[in-house]
Amino acid sequence: MKKQLLSALIGVSLLVPMAASAADYVIDTEGAHASITFKVNHLGYSYVVGRFNDFSGDFSYDAAKPTAMTVNVTVNTLSVDSNHAERDKHIRGEDFLNTGKFAKATFASTSVEDKGNGDLVINGNLTLNGVTKPLAIKAHAVGEGQDPWGGYRAGFTGTTTFAMKDFGIKMDLGPASSHVELDLVVEGVRK
């Protein structure tokens, strides 16, 4: 009797659909399928563009429940690269990133808003130059699926802008140069 009851319970449990849950992903920086690039207006005449070559992170994501998404990223600020060695040295210095004291920047999500059609707003806290402030990233879910190597991937793009002074960056190149624009491309491999 006990065996029949146990068998019946197992059988019923297999028929009940399992609830979808978020999958965990590691950001694919090894395969260069992710990037963090920046753009700053240079004196109102042009732009300085660059990137961070060394960062890592992870996220959890379920397309059926995008508001449950979480994101965590750590950036090695020493890896700043604007394609000009002297400028990079200045950016790493006390006028800007102050990497001697703060060699890392972090972003940790706090909430996600679903705007429909794959558009999201990822709210979180950015810690840069020893200062933590709220930051909203406008993001878009590009797609997800199996890769040719037997893994599963999900990808996103994102943009955000912040004022340098909000993060204790005191260098003043004028009002045209007061903000940083970040462009993000993230592809994650399911863990």
Swiss-Prot record:
SUPFAM superfamilies: YceI-like. The keyword Cell membrane does not apply. Keywords: Periplasm, Signal. Its main location: periplasm. Gene3D superfamilies: Lipid/polyisoprenoid-binding, YceI-like (2.40.128.110). Residues 1-22 form the signal peptide. GO terms for cellular component: periplasmic space. It is found in: Periplasm. Pfam families: YceI. NCBIfam families: PRK03757.1. Belongs to the UPF0312 family. Type 1 subfamily. This is UPF0312 protein Sputw3181_1309. It comes from Shewanella sp. (strain W3-18-1). The lineage of its organism: Bacteria, Pseudomonadati, Pseudomonadota, Gammaproteobacteria, Alteromonadales.
